[in-house]
Amino acid sequence: LVAFCSASQDIVVDAWRTEVLAPEELGPGAGVHILGYRVAMLTSGAIALILADRMPWRVVYLLMAGSLVVGMAASILAPEPELAAKRPRTLKEAVVEPFLEFFARRGAAGILMFIVFYKLDVVMATALTTPFLLELGFTKTDIGAVTKGLGMIATIAGTLAGGAIVARTGMKASLWIFGILQSVSTLAFLALARLGHHYPMMVAAIGIENLCSGMGTAAYAAFLMSLCDKRFTATQYALLTSLMAVTRVIVGAPTGFLAKTYGWETYFIISALAAIPGLLFLLRYDRWTGGHHA
């Protein structure tokens, strides 16, 4: 029930954000949204566990539930989107027509492939981060402190910086810049694989990767929002974001095999090269947007 309600709320919030924000606000809006998501993860994860050491779980859950009052108040105070289009009245208008509208667009298949492949390199590089670091001799405490502490800070900084850069340089340029940075950042793990148990390099690798990935995520989310027809934001954004899970499915099976067969150094080189398909699809950006959102 909690998962169902949470997913439903995510769809509504994503649709509202897409409808309310102006095109030039999509980048910063995506950055702030991801910031809120990360803070929520920190609050419901680390902070909740710290509180659970000092009070009963019943009280902790009540406090977590009480924190939702902030979100409720924000929802009440949030402005309604200014839409001229009528709201859907039938299942066809709400579900079928959004799909038909999207797939009737020029380059729809290429857009979907771009969504699947744009962050393939990041997903590959991070899929085996913990086993990789354990094999190098780092303790679970070391890994947890750096990935959950520094990693989260770097991700938040990356998303906020990425959102600001999207607003300043434009969507197309940002997707190119961050796509390349994401690929290059995975090579920090290659350097760590060559150095072995080297704590400063481990900190640097995780920090750099999370920073660049955060910037890429901000531009990626802003681009998805820009693709939505404002008459069908909820359905279309749900369709586009659901494809992000396909990337993890693609990566899930071969990662362990590649690392075991070819070794960590080759694996991270392959991870960096995995950015190429997404960047090749990005060459068709103007075709998708008709030259808008550049």
Regions found by a protein language model. Name each.
Residues 18, 23-32, 140-141, 230-240:
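Loop-to-transmembrane helix entry/capping segments in MFS-fold secondary transporters
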